[in-house]
Amino acid sequence: MTTASQQTSSHSTASSTSRKGNNNDATPSLKELQLANRTLGTRNAKLVEMLKASRDKLDALNEQIRALSDPPSTYGTLLELNPGGHSAEVFTSNRRMRLVVAPGVDTSQLTPGALVRLGEGQEVVEHCGFSDFGDIAVVKEFLPGGSRVVVADTMGDLRVLKIAAPLYELWSQKNVGAGDQVLVDYRAGYAFESIPKADVENLILEEIPEVSYEDIGGLHNQIEMIHDAVELPFTHPDLYRKFDLQPPKGVLLYGPPGCGKTLIAKAVAHSLAEKMGSGGESYFLNIKGPELLNKFVGETERQIRQIFDRARSIAEDGRPVIVFFDEMDAIFRTRGSGISSDLENTVVPQLLSEIDGVEDLRNVIVIGASNREEMIDPAILRPGRLDVKIRVERPDEKSAREIAELYLVDTLPLDPALVEETGDRHAAVAALIDELSSRMYAQHSDNEFVELTFVDGSREVLYYRDFASGAMIANIVDRAKKNALKRALASGQPDNHGVSLEDVRTAVDQEFAENDDLPNTANPDEWARISGRTGQRVTEVTVAHHNRKTTTETEATEPEGTDSGKGHTDAS
């Protein structure tokens, strides 16, 4: 009994132990649970991201569906916002309509002329700025009040339009006026903004010149003549009316190149600005003459019209305006003189009509400059058009000294030895100017330029001084300064060097040497005009190359302009 009972108890204990061991093997460990938790968390995060992306994509698709289902928008031009701001007059679909303004629209932006978007029910739902495309028109005048403007279309027909806010702002600041181009919508009846006239502006240098008469040397007589012709009518109009005098419409400055024609014209504008008392404002319209020429028929004439429209618009405010045509012979040649073109047959009459139209504008004058005055059409030069003709001569020795004084001043670095020798800096500068003028105008063999032989056998020698100009003198002074600068750099002691007499001598020689090969001997008759003996023909031009001579001679046996093979050119 005892043994059987013990066996039963032992078996029960073993069974219990066996079950306990099996339960421990089936239970996961803590690490396993943590790993499983992290895995599930990662999967859950990915699912959340995928769900969010799917939701965003679904929203985008729904938005596209809604956009595709929306009706198309209509745009119009706001004409007027009615009192209360709940309705507005809008021009749309070629008709004027009174439409409701949707709630939420900022009515402060709804200014006349604005572009607005209309909803499905033809209500104003959005302000879209101002139209940036349309037709181009030219302003004729702004009507009193600043709300309307008279413009001319491409056919010259006049229209009255209302002014949008951007253009009104320009008008109130006096930044737009007669002659300017504006963007318009003829159907809506509005002008929106000013459009730059690129095709004309690139030909015009509109400025208030800073050149005064004191900046011009050796041209006292010419300055006095242009002062009497241009400034007196502007500054004393009452006296001109009292003496029953008409101010000149134009002035022609003619003479050799580089002698100050453009400087005189600029100085006139500067002087007028100081004397007119118009806030110091004067305008100098410097026309780049050759660029006016255009291969398209009528373009040159149109640009001339626009230039004078510009001048008139500026002059209306009482400001003096000078229209300056440089190289006038390039644009307004004698009619019928063209070889392969008859452009001058239409360009010259256009200028004549514009000059004749200037008679009622007291503040506009035309100044032309040319070194080939004989090529300008005579109709332009007759009294009543370019009334005053002023020849700008080449500088003589006295004038050359005056010009040199503008460039050689005592503030420049001067040669210490020269300053010590002359006594002070003023005397040193005077010595430099004496050396420059005496060397330029010396009448000796080293300064011979060309020798002319006339048809009667007489001869005349032209020297470098006969071809002097203000530009040449300025260039010689610059050469002398550069020579001194290079010597100072080479010495390593720049403070101990300055412009010397030798620098001036070298500069004059360098300038003359560069001109040795420049004389044009192909047409000897041109030299008769240069020498002033226009009554005789030149048959031979001998060019001096220092110690060398190159001869160009004319022979009666060959046609004009042909080379005989002996260094001669026919002029008979």
Swiss-Prot record:
Compositional bias per record (Low complexity), positions renumbered to this chain: 1-18
Binding site for ATP: G258, C259, G260, K261, T262, L263
Location of region: Disordered: 1-30, 543-572
Family: Belongs to the AAA ATPase family.
Coiled-coil segments: 42-70
Gene: arc
KW Repeat (keyword) present: no
Lineage: Bacteria, Bacillati, Actinomycetota, Actinomycetes, Mycobacteriales
Signal peptide start and end residues: none
The protein's assembly and partners: Homohexamer. Assembles into a hexameric ring structure.
GO BP terms: modification-dependent protein catabolic process; proteasomal protein catabolic process
Protein name: AAA ATPase forming ring-shaped complexes
GO molecular function: ATP binding; ATP hydrolysis activity
A GO CC annotation given for this chain: proteasome complex
Compositionally skewed regions (Basic and acidic residues) per UniProt: 563-572
A Pfam family the protein falls into: Prot_ATP_ID_OB_C
Organism of derivation: Corynebacterium kroppenstedtii (strain DSM 44385 / JCM 11950 / CIP 105744 / CCUG 35717)
